[in-house]
C-alpha cells in the first residue's frame, strides 16, 4: 500500500514537501495498478494529469512570452518542442520517478518501451497537477 514507499527522496528532487502527500501518491498511480489492487485507497492519476497538462502549458507559455519577443508561430513551435512525451519522460527519468510509480505487474515489465515513455510523461503532468493543487501556482512554477 501507499505506506510502503518513502517519497522523501522524490520530494527533495522536486523541491517540494507536500502538505497532503496523497496528491503525490495519486500522481504516481497508473490505471493498470488499480486493476490488480481494487482496494487501493486512492484513484489513478488521469485527472491530475489533465490538470497538470494545462499547468505545464501555461508555465511554458508564460516563460516564452515573457522572455522572447519572437512572433507567435516561433513561440508555439518552441513550446511544442519543450512540452511533449519525449521531453517530459526524460525529466521523469532524470528524477528517478520510475521507482516510485504504482504499475501493474505487466506494465512494470515494459521498461524502455514507447508505452513507458507515455506513462512517464503522463506522470510528469500528474505530478505538476499535484503540486499545483497542494501548493499553488507560484510553487509549481
What are these regions (language model features)?
Residues 2-141:
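RNase III-family endoribonuclease catalytic core
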Amino acid at each position: 500500500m501507499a505506506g510502503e514507499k518513502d517519497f522523501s527522496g522524490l520530494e527533495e528532487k522536486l523541491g517540494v514537501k507536500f502538505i497532503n502527500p496523497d496528491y503525490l501518491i495519486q500522481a504516481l498511480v497508473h490505471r493498470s495498478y488499480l486493476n490488480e489492487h481494487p482496494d487501493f485507497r486512492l484513484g489513478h492519476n488521469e485527472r491530475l494529469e489533465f490538470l497538470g497538462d494545462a499547468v505545464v502549458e501555461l508555465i511554458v507559455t508564460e516563460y516564452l512570452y515573457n522572455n522572447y519577443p519572437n512572433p507567435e508561430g516561433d513561440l508555439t513551435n518552441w513550446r511544442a518542442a519543450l512540452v511533449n512525451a519525449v521531453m517530459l519522460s526524460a525529466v521523469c527519468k532524470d528524477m528517478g520517478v520510475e521507482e516510485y510509480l504504482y504499475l501493474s505487474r505487466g506494465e512494470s515489465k515494459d521498461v524502455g518501451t514507447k508505452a513507458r515513455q507515455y506513462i512517464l510523461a503522463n506522470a510528469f503532468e500528474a505530478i505538476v497537477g499535484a503540486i499545483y493543487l497542494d501548493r499553488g501556482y507560484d510553487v509549481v512554477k
